[in-house]
Amino acid sequence: MDFGALPPEINSGRMYCGPGSGPMLAAAAAWDGVAVELGLAATGYASVIAELTGAPWVGAASLSMVAAATPYVAWLSQAAARAEQAGMQAAAAAAAYEAAFVMTVPPPVITANRVLVMTLIATNFFGQNSAAIAVAEAQYAEMWAQDAVAMYGYAAASASASRLIPFAAPPKTTNSAGVVAQVAAVAAMPGLLQRLSSAASVSWSNPNDWWLVRLLGSITPTERTTIVRLLGQSYFATGMAQFFASIAQQLTFGPGGTTAGSGGAWYPTPQFAGLGASRAVSVSLARANKIGALSVPPSWVKTTALTESPVAHAVSANPTVGSSHGPHGLLRGLPLGSRITRRSGAFAHRYGFRHSVVARPPSAG
């Protein structure tokens, strides 16, 4: 618009007849409020996402949520910045209006000038008012120019302040494939419910309906036997090995290292030879036998009187040949009470006895 072509009455009238800078100031305050709300929303979103993904929620779902929410948080931050900028531009437009309003000539001044000019012209009978009329017209021209300058400046400032950067559309945070999958699932639901209802009507009391029975019925007896043997042979072999090992632990070789006795039988180990033949068990308190500092049951050791033989006996003693045959049991351990009772006369325990490694010579006295 060419404001210079318009008289000051129009330009000043427009400036003084409008609503003023109030609407622009209200718009600036509104944009500032929107910027604050968007900034708080972005901060809240970022805080919640950081808290959720920090410790309690991890995995694929958490990563998917972060990937979907992060662009939206960025958009909120960008929108908050744009809203704040819009508020600043609205405030600038209001300031431009105030500046133009101050520069604009008030309409009453223009009206007074026009009235003065008309009065001077009406009373200028002899040309005595010509100079006053020229001064009044010059003042009016200045008013014209002043209003035109004010309006041109206001138009330029308001145009620059009202040039807002367009807001970007919010990003899409949903997965379009999920919508398609949901539609497909809803479409398939009636058929699924129908199949479930038909499956529920099947009578399960008939053994032929069991899949295992049908499977076993479709193979031959030989194949079934093979399956059972393959499945159970490892457990059967292990059990048999443990059984024979337990028997072998309670048997011994026969005399002379043979594997059988005189009657072809295996010998039981001495540890189990007296099972069932020992005396009744008696119990007493603080009456245990002692082997050194060790307390032992009464049936373990029966102390025999040991006397030292003279040196001559030790020198001329004839070594005795032990039994050439004896049991060689698989189990070793402490002798049982019945065995000690029967064989206590054959040998004497030498617990605590001091052995002589080198015989004392006769010359030593």
Curated annotation (Swiss-Prot):
GO terms for biological process: response to host immune response. SUPFAM superfamilies: PE/PPE dimer-like. Belongs to the mycobacterial PPE family. Transmembrane segments: none annotated. It comes from the Bacteria. This is Uncharacterized PPE family protein PPE25. InterPro entries: PPE_C, PPE_dom, PPE_sf. The gene is PPE25.
